[in-house]
Amino acid sequence: MDEGYGGMSNAELRRKVCHEPRRKHRERRATHHGPERSYQAFLSLPEGERARACEMDTVCGRPTDSQCLLTLMSRACRVQLPLLMPTKTKAATVARLDEVERAIGLDAFRRLSDPILTDNGCEFEDAGGIERSCTVPGERRCRVFCCDPMQSQQKGACERNHVEIRKMLPKGRGISFDDLDEVDAWFVGSNVNSEPRPSLMGLSPLAMLRAADPELADALARGLGICELPYDDLGLTLAAVNGERAGRGLAPLA
């Protein structure tokens, strides 16, 4: 019928003309990693290692923006770090993780981010660069594993937790991530990780982290500016971000 055979056209089919054309599924592109970094390899890790894994992803603003947020989320305590990146590229990802390692130290980086589970995005293609330490030559700072293609639910905790970031940097408001700076990222990270969660028995992710690993909590506060805020000072809104920017003499994001 689509080709016009039989002397009829789609216009003569009363119901078909009311339906939108079906979307074509994107073809799955080949993964950039071998079986040693596959999701099946991740599942073969001991249960304790999988439970404390770090899920890595990116949060983007407008399609035309260059900057984005690289997010690292600890499954164990739900702390999620939003790290500003100048571009969504594999080189920028490695460079940003290098900065984190230098800021908090190799041992703290390992406790926070080993192993890492991420997706098959182009920004995560340099698995070797992500894994190698930049402070101790020849050492490995983490192990990297990737979800199956188009199966982002395999790192669903990270995906769901992005909702908390979107409370402060919502979609559809004309926010350009190119206008963000490091202080904005720290402010968002401190607020999001200071919010009490029912799933953590009323504790915040940072409070849970401090109870489990106070040295790592101190390293994040000292090296990245991510620190727990008093409950009464929390502002999980875009207005709070704009208020903080106004205090620094900057224009609002939207």
Describe the residue ranges of each PLM region.
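Secondary-structure boundary/capping micro-motif
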Residues: M1-D178, V183-R197, A207-A254
